[in-house]
């Protein structure tokens, strides 16, 4: 391959705003690069061989700065306007963070000044909102429910993980330790200048309370989940009431399959929905001066879902753990919507709680629906809404559900029939939008409903990938048309009976890039100026930026953040300030505050003014060398991106052992212009020891459009390694220090799966595979994930076979010291059974392997000692079997 102008196609994606052009930092080709036939044969470089104790000290030294970096990460920002016209501050911004030596997440705030001195950089001070209080827990002290939710949310910190806030009253609500707490700041009570001592929400519940939420219609009331049922509590009167009675807290899980208000495993793990109940934002007034508060909730029946048992002495008092886990091709939970109406008097006391169910069964009203992906309420509380998916996840519906569609739960058949007959025929679900794709639908969080201005219309902004293959914003107006279906006439409704016609659909954004809508990204709508703010990849698939455009008259999309960095942003409710947490490959994250303004006659062209710093960059890390980003044109026609970590003391005339770090699965992008020195610091450690480290995003990874991501539809495991090998060979053609005879591969979860695939499919390329928590048999994995990408197992037998390494164990190499498996014994996501069944087939085929079990760990390694041991084992195994001179002797 010829190299233009004697330079390699290597880029750090560093761009300068001042020049107004895209500037790539390129790396000079190493001496001897090119295709010269007479270049001297390079000698292998062997990494130094350390003892286990020496490696342990080396890791401890590299982690000193790493711990400091992890402690400085404010997040979950919320702006509250100050109302004092003569005061020096315009807003107070709240956030969660860890400070100093304290490793516990807690609430902080900073004051935003009305004016700044533009000649100096203002650093906002972090002020603790909460006084110290006893709510700390070590990892091993979490309840089972908390452990599992933390796994689903990928939470690794202790302390406060989330908070709820009611703007009108200034009420904060949060869970800490085993308790639920509340405080007031802002609102009619003014703003505190001293840390507040949280108030414990007292309870009669014996077990952990989860998922607390403030009632937006009356912040004196909260709801929470206790033992798979919904409870409510009044913060003022301290009255507490259980409002659902579906779970019996039986010791035998098989006899107690129902839950209320709880998102089941697949919804949490595969759809990022962690709650199963939703307060109505408005209360209905009663003639006596009281009010009716409503909660929409889902009720699940998991009686047909398989129970998985995990037995381990490390569970201490729990000798066995049991989980409902729907394996692909088997039954999912049966789900329905229900509604609870809480009638309270003028003094706030509960008069009655009415449990209501749908007038007809869920499966009749919502034929073909398998998953409740999202739910909520319209702003006026007139309708609940839900985003629904079929089992194949190729058909999506957005439906409106009126509270009138629910009737009181009644056991007497005649009384129930009278209640059904009392519901007018005109009250039905309304399908206000639907879409279909032949790939799959990626669920996201973008759905903004405008206040209704016409009784027979509803307007909303939604994001869709189905129309163009890239997720973009659309403003849709649907006509709320009365259904043709007449319940009183008998018979069953057809799905089309509830479909509303689309009056208008406006394309807000377009192009071969995507609007971000998951993992914290959403949209902010300025209804007064008819603007929508969003995060997207318009300027580069490797960088996330904040943009604004008009949704009334779509046209120019204006970028608000600086190029050369990747940003994660949060806007104030008035859209006059935004906070960006940003970094790039060279610079650790900063958090800065910006003020937005624009001419009245040109609201889209915002002027961004730097206002203050919330977190300054820690500067370059000692002994850290950032990777270089590269790209190449794949034979598939796609541009693929990768990262290259060069050995720190690169010597000419040497070729170096190479480690391919891999994930390669959907919904993840490893290669981007973000700082990698915290989460992926081990890759720098490998480079410091003398390894080349390569990371490549193959087809199937995210932020590149549905066609790119959908390339492995029905054939997971069959295309990814081709892309990875092509990337390695491309790099070897550019750099002669890459030793393709000494390549190792390592990844976790899907990356562990592909590490096995690599050794099985291309043992000629990969000398060593280190596979963490791998899927080895797709029929053992869950419905929501596996069927989305692979289809139903009955309809794709060949794909399931070719994608399952356990079924092809005979293809693994017969030499020892080439395969290391790592797995947490308590893994509730990719069960340890995946590893054990692979081992059974490897033994049957007479194939060697090495195994490391982590008895206390689930899918993610959380115990610090386990994490240290894992990294030590990784370094030692690579040293002994890939990088050192002794490894070369083993091959001989």
Curated annotation (Swiss-Prot):
Activity regulation, short description: Inhibited by zinc. Inhibited by the serine proteinase inhibitor 4-(2-aminoethyl)benzenesulphonyl fluoride (AEBSF), and by di-isopropylfluorophosphate. Specifically inhibited by isoindoline derivatives. Inhibited by Val-boroPro (Talabostat, PT-100), a non-selective inhibitor, which triggers pyroptosis in monocytes and macrophages.
Reactions catalysed, as given in the entry: Release of an N-terminal dipeptide, Xaa-Yaa-|-Zaa-, from a polypeptide, preferentially when Yaa is Pro, provided Zaa is neither Pro nor hydroxyproline
Pfam families reported for this sequence: Dpp_8_9_N, DPPIV_N, Peptidase_S9
EC number: 3.4.14.5
Alphabetic keyword roster: Aminopeptidase, Cytoplasm, Hydrolase, Protease, Serine protease
Domain of life of the source: Eukaryota
GO biological process, one term: proteolysis
Location relative to the cell: Cytoplasm
One GO MF term attached to the UniProt entry: serine-type peptidase activity
Disulphides: none
Keyword Endoplasmic reticulum: no
InterPro entries (UniProt xref): AB_hydrolase_fold, Dpp_8/9_N, Peptidase_S9_cat, Peptidase_S9B_N, Serine_Prot_S9B/DPPIV
Catalytic residues in the record: 749 (charge relay system), 827 (charge relay system), 859 (charge relay system)
Keyword Hydrolase in annotation: yes
Subunit structure: Homodimer. Forms a ternary complex with NLRP1, composed of a DPP8 homodimer, one full-length NLRP1 protein, and one cleaved C-terminus of NLRP1 (NACHT, LRR and PYD domains-containing protein 1, C-terminus). Forms a ternary complex with CARD8, composed of a DPP8 homodimer, one full-length NLRP1 protein, and one cleaved C-terminus of CARD8 (Caspase recruitment domain-containing protein 8, C-terminus). In the ternary complex, only one subunit of the DPP8 homodimer is bound to NLRP1 or CARD8.
Stated family: Belongs to the peptidase S9B family. DPPIV subfamily.
Role according to the record: Dipeptidyl peptidase that cleaves off N-terminal dipeptides from proteins having a Pro or Ala residue at position 2. Acts as a key inhibitor of caspase-1-dependent monocyte and macrophage pyroptosis in resting cells by preventing activation of NLRP1 and CARD8. Sequesters the cleaved C-terminal part of NLRP1 and CARD8, which respectively constitute the active part of the NLRP1 and CARD8 inflammasomes, in a ternary complex, thereby preventing their oligomerization and activation.
Protein name, as recorded: Dipeptidyl peptidase 8
Species per Swiss-Prot/TrEMBL record: Mus musculus (Mouse)
């Amino acid at each position: 391959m010829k190299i233009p102008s004697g330079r390699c196609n290597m880029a750090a994606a560093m761009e300068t705003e001042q020049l107004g052009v895209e500037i790539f930092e390129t790396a000079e080709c190493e001496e001897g690069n090119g295709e010269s036939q007479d270049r001297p044969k390079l000698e292998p470089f062997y990494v130094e061989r350390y003892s286990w104790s020496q490696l342990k000290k080396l890791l401890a030294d590299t982690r000193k700065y790493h711990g400091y970096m992890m402690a400085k990460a404010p997040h979950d920002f919320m702006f509250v306007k100050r109302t004092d016209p003569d005061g020096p501050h315009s807003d107070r911004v709240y956030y969660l963070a860890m400070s100093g030596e304290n490793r516990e997440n807690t609430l902080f705030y900073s004051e935003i000044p009305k004016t700044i001195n533009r000649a100096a950089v203002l650093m906002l001070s972090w002020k603790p909102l909460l006084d110290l209080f006893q709510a700390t827990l070590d990892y091993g002290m979490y309840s089972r429910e908390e452990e599992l939710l933390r796994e689903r949310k990928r939470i690794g910190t202790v302390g406060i993980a989330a908070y709820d806030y009611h703007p009108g009253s200034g009420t904060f609500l949060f869970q800490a330790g085993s308790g639920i707490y509340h405080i007031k700041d802002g609102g009619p009570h003014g703003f505190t200048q001293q840390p507040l001592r949280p108030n414990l929400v007292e309870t009669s519940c014996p077990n952990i309370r989860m998922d607390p939420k403030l009632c937006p219609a009356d912040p004196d009331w909260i709801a929470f989940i206790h033992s798979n049922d919904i409870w409510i509590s009044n913060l003022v009167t301290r009255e507490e009431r259980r409002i659902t009675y579906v779970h019996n807290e039986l010791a035998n899980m098989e006899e107690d399959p129902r839950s209320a208000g709880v998102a089941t495993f697949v919804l949490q793990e595969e759809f990022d929905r962690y709650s199963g109940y939703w307060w109505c934002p408005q209360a209905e007034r009663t003639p006596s001066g009281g009010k009716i508060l409503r909660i929409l909730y889902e009720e699940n029946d998991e009686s047909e879902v398989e129970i998985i048992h995990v037995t381990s002495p490390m569970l201490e008092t729990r000798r066995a753990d049991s989980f409902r886990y729907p394996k692909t091709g088997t039954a999912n939970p049966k789900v329905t919507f229900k509604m609870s109406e809480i009638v309270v008097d003028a003094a706030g006391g509960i008069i009655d709680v009415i449990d209501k169910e749908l007038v007809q069964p869920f499966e009749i009203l919502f034929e073909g629906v398998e998953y409740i992906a999202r739910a909520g309420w319209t702003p006026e509380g007139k309708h609940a809404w839900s985003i629904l998916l079929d089992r194949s996840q190729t058909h999506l519906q957005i439906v409106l559900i009126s509270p009138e569609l629910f009737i009181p739960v009644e056991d007497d058949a005649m009384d129930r029939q009278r209640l059904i007959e009392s519901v007018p025929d005109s009250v039905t679900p309304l399908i206000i939008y639907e879409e279909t794709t032949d790939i799959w639908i990626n669920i996201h969080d973008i759905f903004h409903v405008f206040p209704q201005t016409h009784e027979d219309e509803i307007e909303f902004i939604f994001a869709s990938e189905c129309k163009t293959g890239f997720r973009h914003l659309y403003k849709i107006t649907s006509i709320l048309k009365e259904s043709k279906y007449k319940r009183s006439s008998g018979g069953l409704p057809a799905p089309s009976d509830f479909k509303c016609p689309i009056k208008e659909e406006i394309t807000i954004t377009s192009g071969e890039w995507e609007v971000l809508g998951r993992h914290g990204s959403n949209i902010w709508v300025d209804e007064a100026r008819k603007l929508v703010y969003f995060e997207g990849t318009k300027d580069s698939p490797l960088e996330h930026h904040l943009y604004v455009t008009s949704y009334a008259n779509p046209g120019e999309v204006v970028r608000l953040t600086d190029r050369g960095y990747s940003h994660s942003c949060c806007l104030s409710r008035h859209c006059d300030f935004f906070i960006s947490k940003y970094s790039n490959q060279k610079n650790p994250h900063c958090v800065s505050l910006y003020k937005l303004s624009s001419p009245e006659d040109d609201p889209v062209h915002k002027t961004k003014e730097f206002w203050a710093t919330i977190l300054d960059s820690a500067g370059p890390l000692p002994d850290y060398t950032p990777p270089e980003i590269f790209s190449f044109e794949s034979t598939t026609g796609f541009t693929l991106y990768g990262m290259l970590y060069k050995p720190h003391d690169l010597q000419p005339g040497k070729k170096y052992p190479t480690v391919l770090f891999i994930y390669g699965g959907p919904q993840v992008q490893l290669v981007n212009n973000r700082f990698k020195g915290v989460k992926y610091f081990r890759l720098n450690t490998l480079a410091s020891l003398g390894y080349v480290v390569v990371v490549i995003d193959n087809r199937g990874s995210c932020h590149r459009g549905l066609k790119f991501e959908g390339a492995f539809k029905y054939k997971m495991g069959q295309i990814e390694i081709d892309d990875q090998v092509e990337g390695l060979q491309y790099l070897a053609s550019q750099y002669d220090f890459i030793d393709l005879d000494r390549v190792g591969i390592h990844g976790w979860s899907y990356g562990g799966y592909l590490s096995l695939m690599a050794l099985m499919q291309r043992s000629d390329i990969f000398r060593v595979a280190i596979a963490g928590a791998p899927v080895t048999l797709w029929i053992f994995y869950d419905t929501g994930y596996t069927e989305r990408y692979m289809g139903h197992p009955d309809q794709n037998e060949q794909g399931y076979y070719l994608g399952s390494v356990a079924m092809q164990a005979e293809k693994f190499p017969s030499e020892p010291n080439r395969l290391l498996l790592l797995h947490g014994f308590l893994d509730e996501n990719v069960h340890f059974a995946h590893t054990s069944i692979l081992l059974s087939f490897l033994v049957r085929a007479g194939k060697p392997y090495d195994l490391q079990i982590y008895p206390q760990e689930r899918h993610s390694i959380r115990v610090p000692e386990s994490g240290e041991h894992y990294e030590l084992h990784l370094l030692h195994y690579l040293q002994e079997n890939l990088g050192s001179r002794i490894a070369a002797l083993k091959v001989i």
